[in-house]
Amino acid sequence: MSDLASLDTSQHPYLPQSASLLFDAKAKANLSFEQIAQHIGRNEVATAAIFYGQAKASKEDIIKLAELLRLPATALEMQMGGFPDRGRSVEMPPREPLIYRLYEIVQNYGYAYKAILNEKFGDGIMSAISFSTNVEKETDEDGNNWAIITMRGKW
């Protein structure tokens, strides 16, 4: 498989130690996040978030990752068994162009989203804990590729 996501640790100095271990093993196994997600029983975004240290891996996730990536389960458990330190992995504003575009979407549409959500649901917030997200690829009739990012959060 080609075009697999990899990790340049010099670009991500705040990621947990487990990130390097997981990304190196992912590259050696030549696996996509979709393939890894199927093995551990999660969606691919949640799986990638585990690799970046932004989601909590369950004991079962750690065992399945160790098995698939041929890593010592005890080493993974030591590095991933605690609680994630979310939100520290990226400088703000982000410099990476795709991450910046996502940031820009929130800058441009954040208050519009808030207004519509408040009108539909009343006062409150959308959870980022009771949350799921998915990425799909769509190709239109002209052959242009479109990214579809779905976010689902408890109100």
UniProtKB/Swiss-Prot annotation:
Key words of the record: Lyase
Active site per UniProt: 101, 104, 127
Reactions this protein catalyses: cyanate + hydrogencarbonate + 3 H(+) = NH4(+) + 2 CO2
User: What protein is this chain from?
Assistant: Cyanate hydratase
- What is a single molecular function from GO for this protein? cyanate hydratase activity
CDD domains from the entry?
Answer: Cyanase_C
Role summary: Catalyzes the reaction of cyanate with bicarbonate to produce ammonia and carbon dioxide.
The gene that this protein is the product of is: CYN1
NCBIfam families the record matches: cynS (TIGR00673)
Organism of provenance: Coccidioides posadasii (strain C735) (Valley fever fungus)
Matching PANTHER family, A to Z? Answer: CYANATE HYDRATASE
- The answer to keyword Lyase applying to this record is yes
User: InterPro entries from the xrefs?
Assistant: Cyanase, Cyanate_lyase_C, Cyanate_lyase_C_sf, Lambda_DNA-bd_dom_sf
Identify the EC number(s): 4.2.1.104
Q: Known SMART domains for this protein?
A: Cyanate_lyase
Query: Which spans of this chain does the record mark as coiled coil?
Result: none
GO BP term, pick one:
cyanate metabolic process
Q: Which Pfam families match?
A: Cyanate_lyase
Per the record, the similarity remark reads: Belongs to the cyanase family.
